[in-house]
């Protein structure tokens, strides 16, 4: 039985040098259809352009530009071969394709139960408070408030889901799949364990659905938040203004003041650091106000040299089966131990 487990966990899916470009080709074809043309995803083509226009500006003001002028230097700055051909990136690509199929089932589950129930809760809270109702169409001001309120509620719930993922040992074993990335590209966004993502999705959608139900009671004719390409305008703006640099090697800080409101790519780099001083920091998705309020914010004063990962042996997370099956094995071992604290790795 142990031999079979080793064979399964160490099964490698096309990460040898000769196969890398085959994997990339398959991924690219699927990716173009599934993500790049879909306006509701962070990996929509406009968001890529927004991020890498910013990256190009960063390059032009960097020392590298003045020492290595030319388009090849710019391309190597934005898309370094050692990162984009890294085993970790190849695993990101494979996981992204697999997860895209699993996500359809996951969202079917949460749309049937938690989201509908949360919407009803918000509706009945408003009714209990005896708030006034109007049959008039909501004004642009109401729609703007609704748009921001649903986003804030979703982000607040995301903050706590993310914090819990780093706090509870069993959940952390599943969240490790994302944090075990040794290098990061925008595709690392899709490197997650399906069970981890399902719980996150429930938290996020419950928050926004309760808020939506609350507004629906007061404005029965409200049709939804203000959107661009079916995406909340707040999210769309955040995505197009460089959010894809969060999972990258390119450092972008928002400065000491704006960073108290929004999570910058640099702050998310800190979150992915294996350095102990960076552990349990910057849990927010879009807004950093939650980290600020609850004492988990870390705003770097200047660029810091960061090693991405979780500080555990890389071979524990170097194959796709290990990233999917490993969390169940480790979680099961936690339940079997009488004293888990002595052996549970501290989440970064």
For the regions a protein language model found, what residue spans apply to each?
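Transit-peptide-like, low-complexity N-terminal presequences
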Residues: 1-45, 68-69, 74-76, 338-348
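Specific transmembrane helices
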Residues: 42-127, 146-154, 158
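Short hydrophobic helices that act as membrane-entry/anchoring signals
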Residues: 2, 6-10, 19-30, 34, ...
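Short, membrane-interfacial amphipathic segments enriched in basic
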Residues: 21-22, 79-87, 257-260
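Alpha-helical hydrophobic membrane-insertion segments
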Residues: 21, 25-29, 116-121, 125, ...
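A membrane-cytosol interface segment of integral membrane proteins
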Residues: 229, 301-348
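Membrane-water interface of alpha-helical transmembrane segments
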Residues: 38, 85, 226-230
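Membrane-embedded catalytic scaffold of the fatty acid hydroxylase/desaturase
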Residues: 98-110, 122-124, 132-306
């Amino acid at each position: 039985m142990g031999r079979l487990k080793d064979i399964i966990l160490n099964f490698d899916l096309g990460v040898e040098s000769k196969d890398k470009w085959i994997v990339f080709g398959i991924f690219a074809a699927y990716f173009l259809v599934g993500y790049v043309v879909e306006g509701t995803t962070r990996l929509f083509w406009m968001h890529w352009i927004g991020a890498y226009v910013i990256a190009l500006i960063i390059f032009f003001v960097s020392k590298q530009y003045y020492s290595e002028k030319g388009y090849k230097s710019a391309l190597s700055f934005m898309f370094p071969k050692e990162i984009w051909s890294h085993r970790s990136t190849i695993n990101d690509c494979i996981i992204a394709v697999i997860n895209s199929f699993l996500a359809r089932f996951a969202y079917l589950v949460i749309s049937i139960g938690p989201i509908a129930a949360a919407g009803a809760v918000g509706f009945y809270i408003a009714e209990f408070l005896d708030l006034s109702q109007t049959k008039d169409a909501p004004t642009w001001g109401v729609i703007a408030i609704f748009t921001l309120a649903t986003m804030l509620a979703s982000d607040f719930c995301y903050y706590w889901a993310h914090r819990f993922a780093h706090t509870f040992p069993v959940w952390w074993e599943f969240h490790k799949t994302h944090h075990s990335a040794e290098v990061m590209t925008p595709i690392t966004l899709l490197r997650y364990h399906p069970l981890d993502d399902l719980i996150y999705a429930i938290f996020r959608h419950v928050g926004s659905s309760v808020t939506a139900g609350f507004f629906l009671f007061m404005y029965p004719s409200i049709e939804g938040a203000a959107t661009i390409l079916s995406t909340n305008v707040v999210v769309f703006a955040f995505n197009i203004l460089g959010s894809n640099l969060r999972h990258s090697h390119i450092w972008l800080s928002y400065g000491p003041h704006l960073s108290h409101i929004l999570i910058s790519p640099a702050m998310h780099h800190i979150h992915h650091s294996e350095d102990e001083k960076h552990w349990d920091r910057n849990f927010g998705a879009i807004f950093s106000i939650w980290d600020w309020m609850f004492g988990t914010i870390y705003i770097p004063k200047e660029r810091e040299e960061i090693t991405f990962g979780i500080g555990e042996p890389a071979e524990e997370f170097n194959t796709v089966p290990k990233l999917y099956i490993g969390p169940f094995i480790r979680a099961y071992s936690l339940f079997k131990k009488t004293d888990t604290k002595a052996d549970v790795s501290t989440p970064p």
